Amino acid sequence: MGSLETEKTVTGYAARDSSGHLSPYTYNLRKKGPEDVIVKVIYCGICHSDLVQMRNEMGMSHYPMVPGHEVVGIVTEIGSEVKKFKVGEHVGVGCIVGSCRSCGNCNQSMEQYCSKRIWTYNDVNHDGTPTQGGFASSMVVDQMFVVRIPENLPLEQAAPLLCAGVTVFSPMKHFAMTEPGKKCGILGLGGVGHMGVKIAKAFGLHVTVISSSDKKKEEAMEVLGADAYLVSKDTEKMMEAAESLDYIMDTIPVAHPLEPYLALLKTNGKLVMLGVVPEPLHFVTPLLILGRRSIAGSFIGSMEETQETLDFCAEKKVSSMIEVVGLDYINTAMERLEKNDVRYRFVVDVAGSKLDN
Protein backbone atom coordinates (compact mmCIF):
# COMPACT_ATOMS: atom_id res chain seq x y z
CA MET A 1 0.00 0.00 0.00
CA GLY A 2 2.05 2.92 -1.24
CA SER A 3 1.43 6.36 0.13
CA LEU A 4 2.72 9.91 -0.09
CA GLU A 5 1.98 10.33 3.61
CA THR A 6 4.83 11.42 5.84
CA GLU A 7 5.71 9.42 8.92
CA LYS A 8 4.32 10.64 12.24
CA THR A 9 6.44 10.67 15.36
CA VAL A 10 4.78 9.34 18.52
CA THR A 11 5.75 8.45 22.06
CA GLY A 12 5.05 5.20 23.83
CA TYR A 13 6.36 3.07 26.66
CA ALA A 14 8.72 0.34 25.46
CA ALA A 15 10.68 -2.59 26.84
CA ARG A 16 14.32 -2.51 25.69
CA ASP A 17 15.33 -5.99 26.85
CA SER A 18 14.04 -9.10 28.61
CA SER A 19 13.97 -7.34 31.98
CA GLY A 20 10.60 -6.12 30.78
CA HIS A 21 11.09 -2.66 32.26
CA LEU A 22 9.06 -0.08 30.34
CA SER A 23 10.22 3.48 29.72
CA PRO A 24 9.36 6.33 27.31
CA TYR A 25 10.26 5.67 23.70
CA THR A 26 9.84 7.94 20.67
CA TYR A 27 9.44 6.35 17.23
CA ASN A 28 7.83 6.81 13.83
CA LEU A 29 4.50 5.29 12.91
CA ARG A 30 4.43 3.56 9.55
CA LYS A 31 2.99 5.66 6.76
CA LYS A 32 -0.79 5.63 6.45
CA GLY A 33 -2.00 3.59 3.48
CA PRO A 34 -5.32 3.92 1.60
CA GLU A 35 -7.05 1.31 3.81
CA ASP A 36 -5.55 2.47 7.10
CA VAL A 37 -6.94 4.48 9.97
CA ILE A 38 -4.91 6.44 12.49
CA VAL A 39 -6.17 5.87 16.01
CA LYS A 40 -5.42 8.17 18.91
CA VAL A 41 -5.17 5.81 21.88
CA ILE A 42 -7.39 6.64 24.85
CA TYR A 43 -7.22 3.45 26.92
CA CYS A 44 -5.28 0.20 26.70
CA GLY A 45 -5.74 -2.89 28.87
CA ILE A 46 -2.86 -4.89 30.32
CA CYS A 47 -2.84 -8.62 29.59
CA HIS A 48 -0.71 -11.34 31.21
CA SER A 49 0.67 -12.15 27.76
CA ASP A 50 2.21 -8.66 27.73
CA LEU A 51 4.47 -9.86 30.55
CA VAL A 52 5.32 -13.01 28.61
CA GLN A 53 6.31 -11.02 25.52
CA MET A 54 8.16 -8.26 27.36
CA ARG A 55 10.30 -10.79 29.20
CA ASN A 56 10.91 -12.98 26.15
CA GLU A 57 9.48 -16.04 27.89
CA MET A 58 8.58 -17.56 24.52
CA GLY A 59 12.00 -16.77 23.02
CA MET A 60 10.54 -14.68 20.19
CA SER A 61 10.72 -11.11 21.46
CA HIS A 62 12.28 -8.19 19.61
CA TYR A 63 13.17 -4.84 21.12
CA PRO A 64 12.36 -2.02 21.50
CA MET A 65 8.83 -3.33 22.10
CA VAL A 66 5.74 -1.21 22.82
CA PRO A 67 3.17 -3.67 24.25
CA GLY A 68 -0.60 -3.36 24.47
CA HIS A 69 -3.31 -5.17 22.50
CA GLU A 70 -6.54 -4.09 24.22
CA VAL A 71 -6.63 -0.70 22.56
CA VAL A 72 -9.51 1.77 22.61
CA GLY A 73 -9.25 5.10 20.88
CA ILE A 74 -10.68 7.60 18.45
CA VAL A 75 -10.15 7.77 14.70
CA THR A 76 -8.21 10.91 13.81
CA GLU A 77 -7.39 10.21 10.15
CA ILE A 78 -8.54 7.75 7.48
CA GLY A 79 -7.01 6.53 4.24
CA SER A 80 -8.50 7.33 0.85
CA GLU A 81 -10.20 3.92 0.53
CA VAL A 82 -11.53 3.59 4.07
CA LYS A 83 -15.30 3.04 4.05
CA LYS A 84 -15.79 1.37 7.41
CA PHE A 85 -14.98 4.27 9.72
CA LYS A 86 -15.18 8.04 9.96
CA VAL A 87 -13.01 10.53 11.78
CA GLY A 88 -14.26 10.96 15.33
CA GLU A 89 -15.57 7.42 15.84
CA HIS A 90 -14.52 5.38 18.87
CA VAL A 91 -12.84 2.14 17.86
CA GLY A 92 -10.92 -0.80 19.23
CA VAL A 93 -7.84 -2.79 18.20
CA GLY A 94 -7.18 -6.27 19.57
CA CYS A 95 -4.41 -8.85 19.30
CA ILE A 96 -3.85 -8.90 15.53
CA VAL A 97 -3.50 -6.19 12.91
CA GLY A 98 -3.01 -8.21 9.74
CA SER A 99 -3.34 -11.56 7.96
CA CYS A 100 -2.85 -13.00 4.48
CA ARG A 101 -6.59 -12.62 3.61
CA SER A 102 -6.41 -15.55 1.15
CA CYS A 103 -5.99 -18.78 3.17
CA GLY A 104 -8.79 -21.08 4.27
CA ASN A 105 -8.91 -19.54 7.72
CA CYS A 106 -9.08 -15.98 6.40
CA ASN A 107 -11.76 -16.97 3.88
CA GLN A 108 -13.85 -18.34 6.76
CA SER A 109 -13.45 -15.20 8.88
CA MET A 110 -11.00 -16.89 11.25
CA GLU A 111 -8.11 -14.49 10.80
CA GLN A 112 -6.71 -15.29 14.23
CA TYR A 113 -5.71 -18.74 12.95
CA CYS A 114 -3.99 -17.48 9.79
CA SER A 115 -0.38 -18.69 9.73
CA LYS A 116 0.65 -15.26 8.45
CA ARG A 117 -1.27 -13.22 11.00
CA ILE A 118 0.44 -10.06 12.18
CA TRP A 119 0.49 -9.43 15.91
CA THR A 120 -0.39 -5.98 17.18
CA TYR A 121 3.13 -5.67 18.57
CA ASN A 122 6.38 -7.63 18.46
CA ASP A 123 5.85 -8.43 14.80
CA VAL A 124 6.47 -6.98 11.33
CA ASN A 125 3.99 -5.16 9.10
CA HIS A 126 3.58 -6.00 5.41
CA ASP A 127 5.84 -3.04 4.59
CA GLY A 128 8.65 -4.36 6.80
CA THR A 129 8.20 -1.92 9.68
CA PRO A 130 7.87 -3.28 13.23
CA THR A 131 4.44 -3.35 14.83
CA GLN A 132 4.06 -1.45 18.09
CA GLY A 133 1.12 -1.65 20.46
CA GLY A 134 -1.26 0.48 22.45
CA PHE A 135 0.96 1.81 25.23
CA ALA A 136 1.50 4.75 22.89
CA SER A 137 -0.23 7.93 21.83
CA SER A 138 -1.32 6.71 18.36
CA MET A 139 -1.39 3.69 16.05
CA VAL A 140 -1.85 3.08 12.32
CA VAL A 141 -4.09 0.06 11.65
CA ASP A 142 -5.70 -1.53 8.61
CA GLN A 143 -9.46 -0.89 8.80
CA MET A 144 -10.17 -4.64 8.55
CA PHE A 145 -8.59 -5.16 11.97
CA VAL A 146 -10.42 -2.34 13.72
CA VAL A 147 -13.79 -2.71 15.45
CA ARG A 148 -16.42 -0.17 16.44
CA ILE A 149 -17.11 0.56 20.11
CA PRO A 150 -20.87 0.67 20.82
CA GLU A 151 -22.03 4.07 22.01
CA ASN A 152 -23.44 2.75 25.29
CA LEU A 153 -20.24 0.91 26.25
CA PRO A 154 -17.87 2.97 28.44
CA LEU A 155 -14.50 3.21 26.71
CA GLU A 156 -12.44 2.01 29.66
CA GLN A 157 -14.81 -0.97 30.03
CA ALA A 158 -14.40 -1.88 26.37
CA ALA A 159 -10.64 -2.38 26.54
CA PRO A 160 -10.57 -5.81 28.28
CA LEU A 161 -13.24 -7.13 25.91
CA LEU A 162 -10.80 -6.88 22.98
CA CYS A 163 -8.74 -9.77 24.35
CA ALA A 164 -10.09 -11.20 27.62
CA GLY A 165 -13.71 -10.82 26.57
CA VAL A 166 -13.51 -12.31 23.09
CA THR A 167 -11.21 -15.07 24.38
CA VAL A 168 -14.15 -16.55 26.30
CA PHE A 169 -16.94 -15.41 23.97
CA SER A 170 -15.47 -17.11 20.88
CA PRO A 171 -15.25 -20.69 22.23
CA MET A 172 -18.63 -20.39 23.92
CA LYS A 173 -20.24 -19.60 20.59
CA HIS A 174 -18.13 -22.02 18.53
CA PHE A 175 -18.62 -25.02 20.83
CA ALA A 176 -22.31 -24.20 21.46
CA MET A 177 -21.67 -23.57 25.15
CA THR A 178 -24.53 -21.09 25.41
CA GLU A 179 -27.60 -23.18 26.30
CA PRO A 180 -29.26 -21.61 29.37
CA GLY A 181 -29.10 -23.83 32.42
CA LYS A 182 -26.03 -25.80 31.34
CA LYS A 183 -23.25 -25.97 33.92
CA CYS A 184 -19.99 -24.21 33.11
CA GLY A 185 -16.83 -24.17 35.20
CA ILE A 186 -14.42 -21.24 35.06
CA LEU A 187 -10.94 -22.36 36.07
CA GLY A 188 -8.92 -19.40 37.31
CA LEU A 189 -10.33 -16.03 38.30
CA GLY A 190 -8.08 -13.44 36.72
CA GLY A 191 -8.62 -11.04 33.85
CA VAL A 192 -9.93 -13.68 31.45
CA GLY A 193 -11.67 -15.75 34.12
CA HIS A 194 -13.73 -12.91 35.52
CA MET A 195 -14.94 -12.08 32.01
CA GLY A 196 -15.79 -15.77 31.61
CA VAL A 197 -18.05 -15.62 34.66
CA LYS A 198 -19.82 -12.49 33.47
CA ILE A 199 -20.32 -13.59 29.86
CA ALA A 200 -21.40 -17.11 30.84
CA LYS A 201 -23.98 -15.66 33.23
CA ALA A 202 -25.20 -13.34 30.48
CA PHE A 203 -25.85 -16.44 28.35
CA GLY A 204 -27.87 -17.94 31.21
CA LEU A 205 -25.42 -20.63 32.29
CA HIS A 206 -24.98 -22.01 35.80
CA VAL A 207 -21.41 -20.95 36.65
CA THR A 208 -18.95 -22.56 39.04
CA VAL A 209 -15.68 -20.77 39.73
CA ILE A 210 -12.77 -23.13 40.40
CA SER A 211 -9.81 -21.62 42.24
CA SER A 212 -6.90 -22.79 44.37
CA SER A 213 -8.14 -20.98 47.50
CA ASP A 214 -11.29 -19.40 48.90
CA LYS A 215 -9.81 -15.87 48.85
CA LYS A 216 -12.01 -14.79 45.96
CA LYS A 217 -15.15 -16.71 46.93
CA GLU A 218 -17.17 -13.82 48.30
CA GLU A 219 -16.33 -11.59 45.34
CA ALA A 220 -16.98 -14.36 42.82
CA MET A 221 -20.40 -15.10 44.27
CA GLU A 222 -21.64 -11.68 45.37
CA VAL A 223 -19.99 -9.35 42.87
CA LEU A 224 -19.43 -11.40 39.72
CA GLY A 225 -22.59 -13.47 40.14
CA ALA A 226 -21.17 -17.01 40.15
CA ASP A 227 -23.58 -19.72 41.30
CA ALA A 228 -20.99 -21.93 43.01
CA TYR A 229 -17.36 -21.86 44.10
CA LEU A 230 -15.01 -24.82 44.27
CA VAL A 231 -11.58 -24.84 45.92
CA SER A 232 -9.38 -27.16 43.89
CA LYS A 233 -7.24 -28.08 46.93
CA ASP A 234 -10.32 -29.33 48.81
CA THR A 235 -10.14 -32.98 47.78
CA GLU A 236 -13.46 -33.90 49.40
CA LYS A 237 -15.41 -31.13 47.67
CA MET A 238 -13.72 -31.90 44.35
CA MET A 239 -14.80 -35.53 44.64
CA GLU A 240 -18.35 -34.48 45.49
CA ALA A 241 -18.39 -32.31 42.35
CA ALA A 242 -17.22 -35.12 40.05
CA GLU A 243 -19.10 -35.38 36.74
CA SER A 244 -21.15 -32.25 37.48
CA LEU A 245 -20.06 -29.82 34.75
CA ASP A 246 -20.91 -29.69 31.06
CA TYR A 247 -17.91 -27.52 30.19
CA ILE A 248 -14.85 -25.96 31.76
CA MET A 249 -13.01 -22.92 30.44
CA ASP A 250 -9.41 -23.18 31.65
CA THR A 251 -7.96 -19.66 31.84
CA ILE A 252 -4.82 -20.47 33.85
CA PRO A 253 -1.69 -19.20 32.03
CA VAL A 254 0.86 -21.34 33.92
CA ALA A 255 1.56 -25.08 34.10
CA HIS A 256 -1.02 -27.04 36.13
CA PRO A 257 -2.41 -30.60 36.30
CA LEU A 258 -5.50 -31.35 34.21
CA GLU A 259 -6.70 -34.58 35.84
CA PRO A 260 -8.56 -32.95 38.77
CA TYR A 261 -10.59 -30.82 36.38
CA LEU A 262 -11.28 -33.47 33.75
CA ALA A 263 -12.87 -35.50 36.55
CA LEU A 264 -15.41 -32.70 37.07
CA LEU A 265 -16.82 -33.10 33.56
CA LYS A 266 -19.93 -35.06 32.71
CA THR A 267 -19.91 -37.62 29.92
CA ASN A 268 -19.30 -35.71 26.65
CA GLY A 269 -17.96 -32.78 28.64
CA LYS A 270 -15.38 -30.44 27.19
CA LEU A 271 -12.43 -28.62 28.72
CA VAL A 272 -11.34 -25.64 26.64
CA MET A 273 -7.79 -24.36 27.13
CA LEU A 274 -7.51 -20.57 26.87
CA GLY A 275 -4.26 -19.76 28.69
CA VAL A 276 -0.90 -19.67 26.95
CA VAL A 277 1.20 -22.26 28.82
CA PRO A 278 4.72 -22.79 27.39
CA GLU A 279 5.37 -25.96 29.43
CA PRO A 280 3.90 -29.41 28.60
CA LEU A 281 0.68 -30.36 30.41
CA HIS A 282 0.05 -33.94 31.53
CA PHE A 283 -3.08 -36.07 31.95
CA VAL A 284 -4.06 -39.74 31.80
CA THR A 285 -6.23 -40.83 28.88
CA PRO A 286 -8.81 -42.90 30.83
CA LEU A 287 -10.27 -39.64 32.13
CA LEU A 288 -11.06 -38.81 28.50
CA ILE A 289 -11.98 -42.12 26.92
CA LEU A 290 -14.14 -43.46 29.77
CA GLY A 291 -16.37 -40.41 29.59
CA ARG A 292 -15.96 -39.36 25.97
CA ARG A 293 -14.59 -36.13 27.32
CA SER A 294 -12.48 -33.84 25.19
CA ILE A 295 -9.83 -31.17 25.51
CA ALA A 296 -9.90 -28.30 23.03
CA GLY A 297 -8.08 -25.03 22.58
CA SER A 298 -9.27 -21.63 21.47
CA PHE A 299 -7.35 -18.48 20.64
CA ILE A 300 -8.89 -15.02 21.03
CA GLY A 301 -11.50 -14.57 18.28
CA SER A 302 -12.07 -13.38 14.74
CA MET A 303 -12.76 -9.78 13.86
CA GLU A 304 -16.45 -10.65 13.47
CA GLU A 305 -16.47 -12.32 16.89
CA THR A 306 -14.67 -9.36 18.45
CA GLN A 307 -17.34 -6.99 17.18
CA GLU A 308 -20.03 -9.44 18.31
CA THR A 309 -18.46 -9.57 21.78
CA LEU A 310 -18.59 -5.79 22.11
CA ASP A 311 -22.17 -5.62 20.88
CA PHE A 312 -23.27 -8.50 23.15
CA CYS A 313 -21.68 -6.95 26.23
CA ALA A 314 -23.19 -3.56 25.43
CA GLU A 315 -26.65 -5.11 24.98
CA LYS A 316 -26.44 -7.30 28.11
CA LYS A 317 -24.70 -4.58 30.14
CA VAL A 318 -21.74 -6.85 30.85
CA SER A 319 -18.95 -4.82 32.43
CA SER A 320 -15.39 -5.72 33.32
CA MET A 321 -13.91 -5.04 36.75
CA ILE A 322 -10.93 -2.80 36.18
CA GLU A 323 -8.37 -0.58 37.85
CA VAL A 324 -7.44 2.44 35.76
CA VAL A 325 -3.81 3.57 36.03
CA GLY A 326 -1.50 6.02 34.28
CA LEU A 327 1.53 5.12 32.20
CA ASP A 328 3.76 6.41 34.98
CA TYR A 329 2.43 3.49 37.05
CA ILE A 330 2.90 0.88 34.31
CA ASN A 331 5.89 -0.96 35.80
CA THR A 332 4.23 -1.21 39.20
CA ALA A 333 1.09 -2.49 37.51
CA MET A 334 3.13 -5.20 35.76
CA GLU A 335 4.69 -6.25 39.06
CA ARG A 336 1.27 -6.43 40.68
CA LEU A 337 -0.13 -8.38 37.74
CA GLU A 338 2.62 -10.97 38.13
CA LYS A 339 1.52 -11.40 41.76
CA ASN A 340 -2.17 -11.58 40.77
CA ASP A 341 -2.68 -8.37 42.73
CA VAL A 342 -5.42 -6.84 40.57
CA ARG A 343 -9.20 -7.10 40.45
CA TYR A 344 -9.34 -8.03 37.63
CA ARG A 345 -7.77 -6.07 34.80
CA PHE A 346 -5.52 -3.04 34.67
CA VAL A 347 -6.51 -0.46 32.08
CA VAL A 348 -4.02 2.27 31.24
CA ASP A 349 -5.34 5.80 30.76
CA VAL A 350 -3.05 6.52 27.83
CA ALA A 351 -4.67 9.78 26.74
CA GLY A 352 -4.62 11.05 30.32
CA SER A 353 -0.90 10.35 30.49
CA LYS A 354 -0.35 13.16 27.93
CA LEU A 355 2.46 11.44 26.04
CA ASP A 356 2.71 13.98 23.25
CA ASN A 357 2.76 17.04 25.48
Curated annotation (Swiss-Prot):
The keyword Coiled coil does not apply. One of its GO terms (molecular function) is cinnamyl-alcohol dehydrogenase activity. Keywords: Lignin biosynthesis, Metal-binding, NADP, Oxidoreductase, Zinc. Its cofactor is Zn(2+). Pathway: Aromatic compound metabolism; phenylpropanoid biosynthesis. Zn(2+) 1 binds at residues 47, 69-70, 163. Gene3D superfamilies: Medium-chain alcohol dehydrogenases, catalytic domain, NAD(P)-binding Rossmann-like Domain. The keyword rRNA-binding does not apply. NADP(+) binds at residues 49, 167, 188-193, 211-216, 251, 275, 298-300. Transmembrane segments: none annotated. InterPro entries: ADH-like_C, ADH-like_N, ADH_Zn_CS, CAD-like, GroES-like_sf, NAD(P)-bd_dom_sf, PKS_ER. Homodimer. This is Probable cinnamyl alcohol dehydrogenase. It comes from Pinus radiata (Monterey pine). The gene is CAD.
